């Protein structure tokens, strides 16, 4: 079932390996089509779960890899990618918190680092030719290792289905736990899990309960709300319910607290980078709580023009992250702008979790620009309401002149 491809002198390839059906088939395919090159399997631990890593090395070696490198990226992923992204306010098309997108640059970077370490001359990924990830990975490779060849089997081989891949492995006596009846395509990390395919391909189908794996259905969530306290320093979550935690530990703690309340579910039809629309269901419990907490503090501390600028940064950042442009000058610039704005994003927030909702119900900050003395509707001693008259006259001056000009024209 494999096609003949002219060897280009590749001797050692680092493959982004998950142990799933696709990458299990890629290992023997590379050997057969790239002159029996050496395959180094690489797996990034970004918090997808210990169960996904059990037996991974043995599986890779059994498939024909000479080595398997499992790199723990969990803490770095949250600290250096998730925290800066949510601090920027980035949210794609108004709903998607970019869980999959944020993971791609750190995985690509670590894959390049392994390639340099073992002296590889090529990188390989198992992304399909229809998806965003091929662009994200290869864009990062281009920025970090333009000298390394990139191999994308899904754009080269003749196999088109799970059945084809299973038959390919069976012909070579390579064992796999995969079956032809897999319903959904899922991708998990510490921040979220995504679900695509199966019944979700028809937008008229409501997602069944079998789609969701991380969060409770909101209607089945507890009838009593739960309150969680978050402390924020410079746009980063530092404490949860009074306990100082590392970024990864804070996210895991919030996942465990928010998931039973059905927080963080979305069902969207998004515009893919490659031009088509796709439907995905995403579960992001802890990230949703973090996002709500940061926005609540921003309401207190950012003035109007700063808030408007942050929204512009967020919109640009969302597209850069989604499109795989993390390692670009513009992304670096936007992250610096976000970091500057986050200097005053300090304080404490209490978030109410109830039936799928995460609502900031209490907030305070030492940098707050909100003054109860000025904002009160009751009697106060600090604000002279007569001062508003001059401001209004100047604020509306352009409108006044425009109207006077129009009246002058009419009278002629």
Curated annotation (Swiss-Prot):
PANTHER family from the UniProt entry: ARGININOSUCCINATE SYNTHASE (PTHR11587:SF2)
Residues annotated as binding L-aspartate: 128, 132-133
Catalytic activity: L-citrulline + L-aspartate + ATP = 2-(N(omega)-L-arginino)succinate + AMP + diphosphate + H(+)
Protein name: Argininosuccinate synthase
Enzyme class: ligase
Record-level GO BP terms: argininosuccinate metabolic process; L-arginine biosynthetic process; urea cycle
Oligomeric and partner information: Homotetramer.
Compartments (UniProt record): Cytoplasm
Annotated keywords: Amino-acid biosynthesis, Arginine biosynthesis, ATP-binding, Cytoplasm, Ligase, Nucleotide-binding
A Pfam family of this chain: Arginosuc_syn_C
Entry GO CC: cytoplasm
EC numbers for this chain: 6.3.4.5
Entry GO MF terms: argininosuccinate synthase activity; ATP binding
Pathway named in the protein's UniProt entry: Amino-acid biosynthesis; L-arginine biosynthesis; L-arginine from L-ornithine and carbamoyl phosphate: step 2/3
Family that this chain belongs to: Belongs to the argininosuccinate synthase family. Type 1 subfamily.
Binding positions (L-citrulline): 96, 101, 132, 136, 185, 194, 270, 282
Annotated positions binding ATP: 16-24, 44, 126
HAMAP family xrefs: Arg_succ_synth_type1
């Amino acid at each position: 079932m494999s096609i003949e491809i002219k060897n280009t002198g590749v001797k050692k390839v680092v493959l982004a390996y998950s142990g799933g059906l696709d990458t299990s088939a890629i290992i023997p395919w590379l050997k057969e089509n790239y002159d029996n090159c050496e395959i180094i399997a690489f797996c990034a631990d970004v918090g997808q779960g210990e169960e996904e890593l059990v037996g991974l090395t043995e599986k890779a070696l059994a498939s024909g890899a000479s080595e398997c490198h499992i790199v723990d990226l969990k803490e770095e992923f949250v600290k250096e990618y998730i925290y800066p992204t949510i601090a920027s306010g980035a949210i794609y098309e108004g709903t998607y918190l970019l869980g999959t997108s944020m993971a791609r640059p750190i995985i690509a970077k670590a894959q390049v680092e392994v390639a340099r370490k073992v002296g590889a001359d090529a990188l390989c990924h198992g992304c399909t030719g229809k998806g965003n990830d091929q662009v994200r990975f290869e864009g990062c490779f281009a920025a970090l290792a333009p000298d390394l060849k990139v191999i994308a089997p899904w754009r080269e081989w003749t196999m088109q289905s799970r059945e084809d891949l299973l038959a390919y492995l069976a012909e070579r006596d390579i064992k796999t736990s995969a079956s032809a009846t897999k319903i959904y395509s899922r991708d998990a990390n510490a921040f979220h899990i995504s679900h695509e395919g199966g019944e979700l391909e028809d937008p008229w189908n409501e997602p069944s309960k079998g789609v969701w794996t991380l969060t409770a259905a909101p209607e089945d969530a507890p009838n009593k709300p739960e309150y969680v306290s978050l402390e924020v320093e410079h746009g980063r979550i530092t404490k949860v319910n009074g306990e100082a935690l590392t970024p990864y530990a804070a996210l895991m703690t919030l996942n465990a607290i928010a998931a039973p309340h059905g927080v963080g579910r979305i069902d969207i039809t998004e515009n893919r980078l490659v031009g088509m629309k796709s439907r995905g269901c995403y579960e992001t419990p802890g990230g949703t709580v973090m996002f709500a907490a940061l926005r609540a503090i921003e309401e207190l501390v950012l003035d109007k023009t700063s808030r408007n600028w942050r929204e512009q940064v967020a919109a640009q950042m969302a597209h850069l992250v989604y499109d795989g442009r993390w390692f670009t000058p513009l992304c670096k610039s936007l992250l610096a702008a976000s970091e500057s704005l986050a200097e005053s994003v300090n304080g404490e927030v209490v978030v109410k979790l109830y039936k799928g909702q995460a609502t900031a119900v209490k907030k305070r900050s030492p940098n707050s620009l909100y003054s109860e003395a000025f904002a009160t509707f009751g009697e106060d001693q600090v604000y002279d309401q007569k001062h508003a008259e001059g401001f209004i006259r100047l604020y509306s001056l352009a409108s006044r002149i425009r109207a006077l000009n129009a009246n002058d024209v009419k009278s002629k």
